[in-house]
């Protein structure tokens, strides 16, 4: 996102938490070339495109970043949170989704420009990454990991 927004203007982003029936979650590691939070763990997500509904954006982002098609997975929209950065031109709403499905690792096709690895993590492993300050948005999305 390179566009600066005025105070009171927001853009829409989405996050897609993808879990397996065994209670583990797919998390990816950000490439070290990222300007912000390189090497941190995260879930798939990104900005909605012009004219795109939130639900369309999360399906697209998960597919682009992981290769997974979550259209027929259990779950869906969970909650929205707002982030404001006054004077920085970076205000946004985040729609958080959770999908649960069987995942065969051969179905994963990571977007190499964005990710440098993945793991299926337990909630405790995710909490440990967060405690180290290495899990993006954890405090805002932690309830999405409660199944």
Indicate where each model-derived feature is located.
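Acidic, metal-coordinating catalytic segment for phosphate/diphosphate chemistry
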Residues: 1-15, 21
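Short, His- and charge-rich active-site/binding loops that engage polyanionic ligands
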Residues: 9, 30-32, 38
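A structural signal for short, well-ordered beta-strand segments
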Residues: 16, 44, 97-99
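Short, catalytically relevant binding-site loops at active-site mouths
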Residues: 32-34, 48-49
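The catalytic Nudix box helix
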Residues: 43-76
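Nudix hydrolase/Nudix homology domain
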Residues: 1-2, 34, 39, 77-147
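Residue-level structural signal for beta-strand termini and adjacent loop
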Residues: 2-4, 31, 54
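Hydrophobic "anchor" residues
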Residues: 24-27
């Amino acid at each position: 996102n390179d566009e600066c927004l005025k105070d009171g203007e927001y853009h829409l982003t989405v996050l897609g938490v993808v879990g397996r029936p065994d209670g583990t979650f797919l998390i990816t590691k950000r490439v070290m070339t990222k300007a912000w939070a390189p090497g941190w763990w995260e879930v798939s997500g990104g900005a909605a495109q012009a004219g795109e509904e939130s639900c369309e954006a999360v399906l697209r982002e998960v597919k682009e970043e992981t290769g997974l098609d979550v259209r027929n997975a259990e779950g869906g929209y969970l909650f929205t949170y707002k982030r404001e950065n006054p004077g920085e031109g970076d205000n946004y709403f985040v729609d958080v989704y959770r999908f649960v499905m069987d995942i065969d690792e051969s179905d994963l096709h990571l977007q190499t420009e964005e990710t440098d690895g993945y793991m299926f993590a337990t909630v405790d492993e995710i909490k440990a990454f967060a405690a180290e300050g290495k899990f993006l948005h954890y405090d805002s999305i932690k309830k999405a990991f409660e199944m």
